[in-house]
Amino acid sequence: MTRKNQVTKRPSHFMAAVGLLILSLALRPAIISIGPILLDIRQAFTLSFTQASLLTSIPDLCMGFLALASPLLAKRFGVNGTIIGSLVLLGLGVVLRSRMESVSGLLFTTFIIGIGIAVAGSLIGGWIKEFYSDHAPMFMGIYSTGLSLGATAAAAGTGALTSATGSWRVGAGIWAVLCVTGILSWLCLAKSHTPPTERRQSRGSVRLPWGNPKAWLIALYFGCSQFLGYAMLAWLASSMLQMHTSAIAPGYLLSAFTLIFTVANFGTGAIAGKSTDRRFLIAISSSLTVLGLAGLAFITTIAPLIFVASTAVGLGSAFTLGMTLPLDQTHSPQQANAWTVFTLFIGYLIAAVGPFGFGALRDLSGGFALPYLLLTAVAVLMLLLTPLLKPAVELRSEMDSAAQIPDLG
């Protein structure tokens, strides 16, 4: 089969966008749904703030460590088979966790959930690079948007379902439905993938960029953004409720955060285009994040929605940029997978400290000012990293030249 035939048998842009969006909807509710019902779970299992933070930190750790295993699984079972299997595992984990009666069972099923999210999520970058390198920022924006829409639905719906049914278990378990739709969608999308492409993709072995300083900078930037994002998703609603800072219900503040985060995801993907230098957008997003978190740390009683919105715009943009930066540095799907896996591994190990550190500081200090001050300091670090994230101009130019192949898909 010629290269031309291999290229023409990729999914169409529209079909791929829809399939990717539906898949991504399933990958965050299992984590985000914990935030609105965290106090209920703490009371049901008599957990401390530090222990409760593990419900968010465990998936982050999985997304870090298991990112390393994803390429091996994809080589053995194919990218599509691995993604579908991960969604099955995720759905089972969500259902089982909602039925657990012990702390150990709660944490174990959270670990299962983390495996499903980790393996599926770490393969998306290479999939985009394989079929849509000429539109990588746009497709990464669609993926990020789907993650955020799923998070928004979980943030808004979990509390409402819990109140309506009188049980946090319904609010935690209902999101397995999105795993079913994700599986069906990806099965349809997989039919448009050419088997020779997957076999070609798995032949080569590309090492992770352990010795590349740029890879470490990108991973650190991504890790800081996820440190902040998961800390906010885990603790925003609970902290606002206990601080009595706003007439707006804490659940709606969390929903506003995730909704604005979603808009920033998509908007950043749309405007990033094929620019060879993303540092201007990185600087803007980091500055907005610093402004928002500093407001929550020091003047929370004055219009917290404004500071929540500023933080959401900054972190929403940072996620799309952080996931796109590894693709900017690479020539091939194999390299893209290696850089993405490395970024996720380092990044999510850093991210796992966010919810845990926030909860631990809350236990130690008895308040939320110190935890939000920690988040502000991490946001400042993101801003300081901006000048160091120089573009790989030569690599990008070669990618743009390759993108001139006509799109016949």
Language-model segments: residues:
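Helix-to-loop junctions at the C-terminal end of transmembrane segments
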Residues: 66-78, 264-277
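Helix-loop-helix hairpin linking two adjacent transmembrane segments in secondary transporters
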Residues: 134-135, 142-190
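Cytoplasmic helix-loop-helix junction between adjacent transmembrane helices
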Residues: 109-146
